[in-house]
């Protein structure tokens, strides 16, 4: 098991999403862990947009990525929208950089031109399949194919002069032991003969992910590459690329997967739809409308706190932490390799805790933005209501469910609660409620008056208050009698 001893040096990390659609919480957690490791050492968090595949790019996706990071309080130090010494920060604007670097690899003999057409490669695959084999473009097959390794320099020069289409492939060495090191998963070894000669530069002159990724990480002086587990199979190739260039490798860390609640399969949009919960931080309004955690009433503090626990936990055992405290306590070495199950109920628990510590005025503003009816309420009254009910709310949306009866007549009445109300004395109770409304001095005076009348008539204070609560709330749950009376009854005439 590899053991990397860190010194408290500044770290440059990057989050490098592709704008191919909305970024779900797996990507957000990757961004969060990168951000935490940078801020813990006073380093830099870079947002780099990997948009070389224009065919898959989705309009609005880059803005969505920036918006969700900002909502969570994760602000890049360097990005397409900020100035930085290592830009541009969109890969589509860095083709001149990749052209220079690919030439260096070709000139040093670590990469070569391949002129095979798609049809010719398809034919090779078909022939191999007939023999029960798998076609791999590598040390065994490359010299029988159309490339600068199997042709003379004159033939290659002639094809290039004529404008023959080509790709640039990486020359993977034969039978070399590749040692990879990962903070989370330790050391591993792989034989290079298992790898194919990956395309580094496509026929249209754009780089592939692997090439652009390594070049940018080096030129942007990235010290730690923290990314998802799905990139583990690419690690050996990336190590070879660093060695071919003669560059120092960054420290790698591959984060564990986030699984469905039942532990079966990677968390996805479909699993969220089936489970009735979002998997995206904020609403996505592309061709397909997708609901976000923000619009479901989750606070960014609650979401960030929960995501931090998916694969990591603080040594001191504390659970409820804001972004500042997470930054202070986070240790990349404590991230585990085992996958984490997504638990929406646990997320709501974290959200509940953060609602308790959030100013009621801020909660009221958020509630107004999410609920049309709440938007019609005078803010001061809504703040008072939120203060009364927030102890029982798991989401911002819950606040309205708990407080709406304070401003509107109940839309329905709970059947079990109605059965506990005395039908015989109901008319008398309602009449007395109206009478007490007219002559009360205060909310507490109103409640005491009703209790006194209940004792005097023999109906009983308990039955009086139960009936009053059902009339006002539609059920037997709610805030204290004095509180809801103060908020629900109109001013004394």
Residue ranges and their predicted role:
Residues 289-371:
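A conserved active-site cap/scaffold subdomain adjacent to cofactor or substrate pockets
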Residues 307, 351, 386-389, 393, ...:
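Short alpha-helical scaffolding segments that buttress acidic/His motifs in well-ordered protein cores
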């Amino acid at each position: 098991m590899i053991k990397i001893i860190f010194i408290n040096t500044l770290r440059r990390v990057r989050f490098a999403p592709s704008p191919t659609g909305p970024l779900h919480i797996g990507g957000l957690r990757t961004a969060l862990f990168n951000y935490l490791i940078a801020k813990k050492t006073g380093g830099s968090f870079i947002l780099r947009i990997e948009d070389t595949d224009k065919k898959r790019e989705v309009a609005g996706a880059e803005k969505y990525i920036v918006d969700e990071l900002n909502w969570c309080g994760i602000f890049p130090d360097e990005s397409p929208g900020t100035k930085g010494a290592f830009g541009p920060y969109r890969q589509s604007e860095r083709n001149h950089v990749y052209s220079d670097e690919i030439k260096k690899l070709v000139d040093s003999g670590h990469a070569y031109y391949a002129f095979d057409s798609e049809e010719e490669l398809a034919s090779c695959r078909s022939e191999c399949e007939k023999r029960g084999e798998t076609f791999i473009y590598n040390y065994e097959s490359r010299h029988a194919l159309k490339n600068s390794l199997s042709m003379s320099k004159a033939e290659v020069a002639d094809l290039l002069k004529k404008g023959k289409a080509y790709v640039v492939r990486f020359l993977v060495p034969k039978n070399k032991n590749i040692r990879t090191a990962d903070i989370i998963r330790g050391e591993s070894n792989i034989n290079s003969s298992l790898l194919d000669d990956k395309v580094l530069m496509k026929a249209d002159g754009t780089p592939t992910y692997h090439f652009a990724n390594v070049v940018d990480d080096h030129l942007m002086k990235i010290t730690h590459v923290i990314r998802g587990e799905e990139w583990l199979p690419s690690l050996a190739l990336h190590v070879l690329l660093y060695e071919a260039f003669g560059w120092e490798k960054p420290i790698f860390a591959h984060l564990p997967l986030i699984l469905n609640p039942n532990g079966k399969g990677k968390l996805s949009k479909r699993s969220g739809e089936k489970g009735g919960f979002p998997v995206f931080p904020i609403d996505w309004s592309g061709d397909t409308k997708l609901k976000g955690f923000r619009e479901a009433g989750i606070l960014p503090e609650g979401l960030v706190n929960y995501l931090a626990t998916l694969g990591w936990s603080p040594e001191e055992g504390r659970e409820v932490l804001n972004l500042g405290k997470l930054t202070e306590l986070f240790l990349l070495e404590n991230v585990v390799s085992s996958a984490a199950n997504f638990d929406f109920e646990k997320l709501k628990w974290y959200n509940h805790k953060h609602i308790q510590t959030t100013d009621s005025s801020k909660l009221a503003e958020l509630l107004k933005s999410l609920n049309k009816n709440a938007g019609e309420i005078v803010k001061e009254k809504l703040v008072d209501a939120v203060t009364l009910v927030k102890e029982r709310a798991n989401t911002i949306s819950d606040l309205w469910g708990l407080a709406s009866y304070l401003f509107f007549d109940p839309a329905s009445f709970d059947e079990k609660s109605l059965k506990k109300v005395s039908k015989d004395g109901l008319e008398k109770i309602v009449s007395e409620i109206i009478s007490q409304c007219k002559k009360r001095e205060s909310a507490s005076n109103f409640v005491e008056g009703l209790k006194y009348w209940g004792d005097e008539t023999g109906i009983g204070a308990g039955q009086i208050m139960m009936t009053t609560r059902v009339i006002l709330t539609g059920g037997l749950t709610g805030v204290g009698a004095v509180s809801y009376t103060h908020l629900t009854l109109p001013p004394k005439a």
